[in-house]
């Protein structure tokens, strides 16, 4: 594409065979389109179309260029060009008719695309190009069973070869080249395949069939994830593991049901025997000094997370429980819908999910003196996400609103807003490098970050803003896939004062009446400040056999007072692997608690 752009813009004369200004301008426009500079190509083609409004090749090239632009006005102009073309392209010109079908599809006029595909199938039922376009159109509309019928018919024709390749009569004796729907129309005026069968074409069709067949493969996944976060022993430290086992059962080609059974073991360590840290845990600060422990000092929990749900192209739902066997067990789940509105993609979600940052927030805990249980926090709310592409950039905006509740924990509210922009800065046959920026803003109604009775043990500043710069490299070589993602960030947060016991005026008054060794009061002081953070996520996956894949993932997060480390090893077994294409990045097993 760089060479095409250079040729289109340099002053070097074009070949003498392009004898007229029209031919030269058209050739330059095609070079610009080959370089993906569609706006410049459209600007060059518009005067040609105005000067020669009946020139079919110019109008087709202009429609092709406009259909690849994201501006709504350009899409409308492309639709106007397509409306003009549909009555003027000869019915027997299969190449141009298929080019028009791709334009309809690109600008979102799916009714016109389907109607044209139906007419072409009626007129050319033995043309593999027509069958392939119809198959891809059905696949785009998620009609996978019908797409398979067309793909298999095209494969049969290509495997035995064509007796007479279709041809198209084009202006200016334009050469015919193979169709590639991802390339500009100017470079693909026909899709004539060789006779006998072309192995590359047969392999491509077979790959598309295999990709659809992969949608209905049963599989099972299992993993072991080690958790580690060093902080105050017995209170905010967290060590342990989660062992997810997930069975995936296909629902035709449309999606998969799944069943999660995840064993979980968490350990915060031993509570301090005395001292200021102990006063900030449970009800200790409200009870007489020296009160004996009613529970063991070791703070830990074992349980099982269970979930059942469905993941399809545009619908996802699940229902389950977290922490069967923990001090607090919660019903969790979610429902989400994705789709497109013009050039925008959206996701709407309602959810109820666990907060897993500490033993207290995830499993709940028992007060060491009274034995009362508190914690086990869940976020119940709704979220929305809107995304689109702007030239080479992808951008998204998301908003999440939730109420946070737990057993004997004060109710809280949370608002999270995030904007992100990224683009691929390097592409190669083996992988891609993506660079971006993300701005996040959070607001909590209360700061319940502490571990005394009524707090939730989860980070909840009143206000938080951060700017992050993520860099990601992912790819595949042979049976090996990889992902490396690093990010640096700066943030600013602030919190107000918070009582030790926001849920209980009685406990708060008892704590105020108890003499404090340092003369202080049972109130957590407010604070504000800035910080610097960095994170890393790396994953490797290897396809050992067509049935079995093994992988590992490491996640690190580092900031002033937060430094968790997670490491996972996992495996995936496909019962009917066939020849499904490999993913271009690892797909680690997801624990149910992280949905």
Task: Please report, for each region that a protein language model flagged, where it lies by residue.
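Gram-negative and organellar
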Residues: 1-595
């Amino acid at each position: 594409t760089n060479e095409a752009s250079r040729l289109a813009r340099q002053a070097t004369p074009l070949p003498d065979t392009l004898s007229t200004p029209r031919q030269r301008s058209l050739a330059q426009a095609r070079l610009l389109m080959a370089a993906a500079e569609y706006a410049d190509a459209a600007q060059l083609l518009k005067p040609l179309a105005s000067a020669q409004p009946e020139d079919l090749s110019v109008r087709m090239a202009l429609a092709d260029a406009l259909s690849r632009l994201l501006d709504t006005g350009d899409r409308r102009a492309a639709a106007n060009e397509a409306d003009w073309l549909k009555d003027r392209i000869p019915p027997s010109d299969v190449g141009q008719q298929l080019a028009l079908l791709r334009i309809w599809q690109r600008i979102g006029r799916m009714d016109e695309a389907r109607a044209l595909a139906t007419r072409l199938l009626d007129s050319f039922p033995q043309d593999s190009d027509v069958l392939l376009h119809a198959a891809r159109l059905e696949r785009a509309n998620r009609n996978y069973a019908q797409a398979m019928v067309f793909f298999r018919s095209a494969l049969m024709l290509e495997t035995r070869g064509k007796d007479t390749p279709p041809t198209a009569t084009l202006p200016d004796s334009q050469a015919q080249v193979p169709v590639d729907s991802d390339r500009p129309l100017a470079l693909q005026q026909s899709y004539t395949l060789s006779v006998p069968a072309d192995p590359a074409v047969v392999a491509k069709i077979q790959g598309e069939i295999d990709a659809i067949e992969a949608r209905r493969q049963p599989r099972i996944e299992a993993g072991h994830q080690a958790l580690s976060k060093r902080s105050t022993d017995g209170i905010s430290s967290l060590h342990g593991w989660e062992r997810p086992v997930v069975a995936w059962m296909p629902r035709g080609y449309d999606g998969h049901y799944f069943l999660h059974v995840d064993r979980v073991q968490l350990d915060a360590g031993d509570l301090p025997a005395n001292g200021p840290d102990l006063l900030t845990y449970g009800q200790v600060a409200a009870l007489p000094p020296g009160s004996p422990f009613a529970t063991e000092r070791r703070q830990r929990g074992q349980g099982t997370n269970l979930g059942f749900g469905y993941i399809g192209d545009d619908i996802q739902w699940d229902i389950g429980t977290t922490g069967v066997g923990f001090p607090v067990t919660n019903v969790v789940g979610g429902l989400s819908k994705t789709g497109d509105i013009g050039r925008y993609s959206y996701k709407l979600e309602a959810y109820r999910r666990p907060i897993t940052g500490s033993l207290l927030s995830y499993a709940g805990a028992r007060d060491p003196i009274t034995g009362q249980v508190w914690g086990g926090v869940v976020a119940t709310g709704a979220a929305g996400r809107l995304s689109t592409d702007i030239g080479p950039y992808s951008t998204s905006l998301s908003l999440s609103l939730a109420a946070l509740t737990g057993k004997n924990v004060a109710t809280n509210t949370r608002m999270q807003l995030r904007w992100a922009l990224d683009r691929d800065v390097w592409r190669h046959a083996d992988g891609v490098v993506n660079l971006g920026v993300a701005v996040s803003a959070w607001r909590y109604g209360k700061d319940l970050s502490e571990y005394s009775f009524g707090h939730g043990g989860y980070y909840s500043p009143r206000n938080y803003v951060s700017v992050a710069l993520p860099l990601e490299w992912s790819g595949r070589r042979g049976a090996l896939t990889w992902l490396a993602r690093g990010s640096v960030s700066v943030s600013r947060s602030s919190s107000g004062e918070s009582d030790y016991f926001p849920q209980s005026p009685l406990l708060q008054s008892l704590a105020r009446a108890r003499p404090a060794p340092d003369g202080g009061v049972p109130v957590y002081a407010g604070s504000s400040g800035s910080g610097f953070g960095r994170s890393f996520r790396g994953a490797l996956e290897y396809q050992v056999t067509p049935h079995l894949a093994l992988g590992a993932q490491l996640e690190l997060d580092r900031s002033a007072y937060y430094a968790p480390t997670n490491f996972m090893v996992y495996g995936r077994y496909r019962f009917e692997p066939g020849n499904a294409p490999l993913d271009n990045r690892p797909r680690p097993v997801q624990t149910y608690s992280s949905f």
